[in-house]
């Protein structure tokens, strides 16, 4: 599937995602800002071999294998972050985003490798509780967690997503009532090999 098509689809999904809606600066050319953010996410996913696609590209996930003490290339990260600051978030949002990210990262493991679901979305006309695309995507990344014997972490600001995650064997381990009035739920999937209940349907 062409990378530009994937970027377009991720950009459209991000518009329906509360966390992305909050960080992308409002005003003219907002669609362009969402697309810049989508390009950054997709290219980072490809670089890290973390992009998961449903066969028709209707479902897209980004699943990183993460190490708590892993260091990124400072200059490369700085250039990318400045690009996001100028073209996506704007300066007003920057401090709040950094504060929120620090809190989110504090909820993740302090040692040992783990999987982190940075993004999981389905194009609009393929969504729904009975979506084959959703089940396919879920099976893909839970099988990776089981295969690699690594816990899988995710967070969401959408209550109905919490219900779906829990149906798939995730446990809700933390709830954050944010200063802006929004709520964020933190979830993790512990593979059966690590003593978790796993997904009963897997």
PLM ranges: what are they?
Residues 1-16:
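A short beta-loop-alpha structural element at the N-terminal edge
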Residues 46-64:
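Conserved beta-hairpin
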């Amino acid at each position: 599937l062409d990378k530009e098509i994937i970027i377009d689809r991720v950009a459209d999904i991000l518009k329906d995602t509360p966390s992305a809606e909050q960080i992308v600066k409002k005003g003219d050319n907002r669609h362009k800002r969402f697309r810049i953010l989508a390009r950054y996410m997709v290219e980072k996913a490809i670089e890290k071999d973390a992009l998961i696609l449903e066969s028709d590209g209707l479902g897209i996930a980004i699943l990183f294998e993460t190490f708590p003490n892993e260091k990124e290339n400072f200059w490369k990260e700085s250039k990318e972050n400045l690009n996001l600051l100028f073209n996506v978030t704007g300066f007003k949002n920057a401090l709040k985003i950094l504060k929120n990210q620090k809190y989110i990262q504090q909820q993740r493991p302090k040692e040992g490798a783990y999987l982190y679901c940075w993004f999981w979305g389905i194009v609009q006309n393929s969504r729904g509780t009975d979506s084959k695309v959703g089940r396919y995507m879920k099976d893909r990344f839970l099988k990776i967690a089981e295969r690699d014997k690594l816990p899988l972490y995710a967070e969401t600001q959408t209550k109905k997503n919490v219900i779906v995650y829990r149906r798939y064997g995730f446990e809700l381990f933390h709830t954050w009532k944010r200063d802006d009035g929004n709520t964020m739920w933190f979830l993790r999937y512990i593979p059966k090999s690590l003593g978790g209940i796993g997904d009963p349907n897997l």
